């Protein structure tokens, strides 16, 4: 498994905790590859990374955004499977081990799991599947974040993240899903998502939110352009996802232009 960790402005303690959560898994050095893509951070964490493991692949590049940082990681990935992790998050060992067992013992292209805002998580149930990614999208609400997916590298082909935008996951993830022929999914919470003030998804600057909405609109346009070229089943799945994202966009526009307390009361 190639673990692609993107790093920009996260506190070093969080990055080290992230890497340690990968090292804690039941994978030996030949079964894992840890890639840290430094997207132009003010301080290089290379010394701290070497102290954790001498086998970490570290690359530092000028700030180009999360999408391009992940693309860099993809080009360096040597594992059969890929797992993306943001540098301030971490994997929850017991639940993630279930995902590893699935790729070890079953023929699968992708394992979907849940995220948690708590660091402790225990496996709750067996995974369901296999089904196709198309079938999953047709009957389930898809989480945008690609970080809750462990997937086979070869299904990517030429698929990459869009560069220089927010909402890069919303464009990338549904296209990735359509490429998965054998998918397992579980409600187990294997990914700890840290809600941190100052992180990219918790900014309060109005200009940032306006840019976020503009980028989301462009993502919708680009996904819609691809629909006409898809086979019938894939088209139905993608149209359902576009409808979900459109409703999210409408809600977020209303939130930005109206009083949020009043909006939540009405809803």
Which residue stretches match the model-derived regions?
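C-terminal subregions of glycosyltransferases and related glycan-biosynthesis enzymes
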Residues: 194-267
């Amino acid at each position: 498994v190639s673990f692609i960790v993107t790093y920009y402005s996260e506190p070093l303690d969080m990055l080290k905790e992230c890497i340690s959560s990968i090292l804690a898994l039941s994978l030996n050095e030949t079964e894992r590859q840890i890639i840290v893509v430094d997207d132009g951070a003010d301080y290089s964490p290379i010394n701290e990374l070497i102290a954790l493991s001498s086998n970490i692949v570290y690359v530092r590049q000028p700030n180009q955004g999360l999408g391009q940082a992940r693309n860099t990681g993809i080009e360096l990935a040597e594992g059969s499977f890929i797992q993306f992790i943001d540098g301030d998050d971490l994997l929850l060992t017991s639940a993630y081990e279930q995902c590893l067992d699935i790729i070890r013992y079953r023929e699968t292209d992708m394992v979907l799991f849940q995220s948690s805002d708590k660091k402790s998580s225990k496996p709750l149930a067996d995974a369901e599947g296999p089904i196709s990614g198309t079938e999953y999208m047709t009957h389930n609400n898809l989480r945008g974040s690609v970080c809750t997916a462990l997937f086979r590298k070869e299904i990517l082909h030429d698929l990459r993240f869009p560069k220089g935008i927010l909402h890069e996951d919303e464009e990338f993830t549904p296209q990735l899903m359509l490429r998965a022929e054998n998918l397992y999914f579980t409600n187990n919470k294997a990914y700890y998502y840290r809600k941190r003030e100052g992180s990219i998804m918790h900014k309060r600057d109005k200009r940032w939110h306006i840019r976020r909405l503009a980028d989301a609109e462009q993502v919708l346009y680009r996904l819609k352009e691809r629909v006409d070229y898809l086979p019938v089943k894939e088209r139905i799945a993608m149209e359902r996802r576009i409808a979900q994202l459109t409703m999210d966009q409408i809600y977020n526009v209303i939130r930005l232009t109206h009083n949020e307390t009043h909006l939540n009361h009405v809803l």
